[in-house]
Regions:
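Membrane-embedded alpha-helical segments of multi-pass membrane proteins
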Residues: 26, 30-34, 41-50, 83, ...
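Hydrophobic/aromatic-rich transmembrane helices and adjacent perimembrane loops
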Residues: 195-218
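Conserved catalytic motifs of ABC-family nucleotide-binding domains
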Residues: 1-55
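Transmembrane catalytic cores of multi-pass membrane glycosyltransferases
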Residues: 2-16, 42, 73-168, 172, ...
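Short hydrophobic alpha-helices at membrane interfaces in multi-pass membrane enzymes
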Residues: 56-71, 99, 109-110, 176
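Intrinsically disordered, polar/acidic, low-complexity terminal segments
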Residues: 224-296
């Protein structure tokens, strides 16, 4: 599929193995591979993965809201993606046994999340500039143009895993919920590069790939070896990203100078400056609730 897409774009097939998880660009956004997320936003994905793991391991509901609230401190978009996963799971558990309601209504599930929401929410609301390219996909494309892309994307990104693990679905509500959430995330877009889709998908993708890894470990025999081989081939992304970092370091011969070493958005690209100024800087911040009551 990536070869076909690149051929249409006029790109050499030799490039086909580079960043396989981005096969659908520029026709659609993408779900980042685990190593891609580590490469570009390790400060977000590692905490989110750890928090998701804690929630999965903690089978009772007494602290699910407590652990969830930590995602707001690291990645608000990932928090948006994890919220429906937890909400549906808790609702499902309560539907099966309403007596669990007392387990949900605990101090740590109510007080701490509200406190974090107050601090983090007021901080982000200090920037009153609207996000560029924010809204439902049909705001940017006609439905009949979007839907074929969406169907192809879902079939190729999730279809293989769904089919392979179809027998696992009836055993795990976490897996079913994660697939459902991943079906809906592509319908909304935030920022030019659609950071929402790449970050909000982190928790659900992590859950899916944990189950996928377990499935592979249980099925390493010849009849299903082809699927495992395909999974190994896609790991080229991790190797390429590591090589990319090593090569850049060797070429530089010293720490690579980036905008972070000087000033954020210190570039001659006016579009980047305009985007960064609106998305990452809070103007008139001294009039905001966060500055007046929380920051000092």
């Amino acid at each position: 599929m990536r070869l076909i897409v690149l051929k249409v774009q006029g790109v050499s097939p030799l490039y086909a193995t580079w960043r396989i998880d981005e096969w659908c660009r520029p026709y659609f956004s993408y779900y980042g591979a685990n190593w891609t997320s580590l490469y570009w936003c390790f400060n977000q994905c590692i905490p989110v993965w750890l928090i998701t793991s804690l929630i999965l391991l903690n089978n009772d509901l007494k602290s699910v809201g407590f652990w969830y609230s930590f995602t707001l401190l690291y990645s608000p978009w990932a928090a948006m993606g994890l919220f429906p996963v937890i909400f549906i799971y808790v609702a499902y558990r309560l539907f099966k046994d309403i007596k669990l309601m007392l387990s949900v209504l605990t101090l740590q599930n109510i007080v701490f999340p509200l406190f974090v929401l107050l601090v983090v929410g007021s901080f982000y609301m200090s920037n009153r500039h609207p996000l560029a390219d924010c809204g439902w996909w049909w705001k940017f494309e006609q439905p009949m143009v979007f839907l074929p892309k969406y169907i192809a994307f879902i079939l190729l990104e999730l279809g293989i895993y769904f089919y392979a693990m179809r027998n696992e679905l009836c055993k795990s509500s976490w897996l079913i919920i994660s697939f459902v959430v991943l079906l809906f995330i592509p319908f909304y877009k935030m920022t030019v590069w659609n950071d929402f889709m790449m970050r909000a998908s982190l928790p659900a993708l992590f859950i899916v790939f944990m189950y996928w890894t377990r499935w592979c470990m249980r099925n390493l025999h010849s009849r299903r070896m082809l699927i495992v081989v395909v999974y190994v081939v896609t790991s080229l992304t991790a190797l390429q990203l590591m090589v990319n970092s090593l090569v850049d370091t060797v070429r530089a011969g010293k720490p690579v100078l980036t905008n972070a070493n000087e000033r954020f958005c210190n570039t001659s690209d006016l579009e980047v400056v305009k985007l960064g100024d609106g998305q990452f800087f809070a103007h008139d911040y001294k009039t905001t609730f966060f500055w007046k009551y929380l920051s000092r």
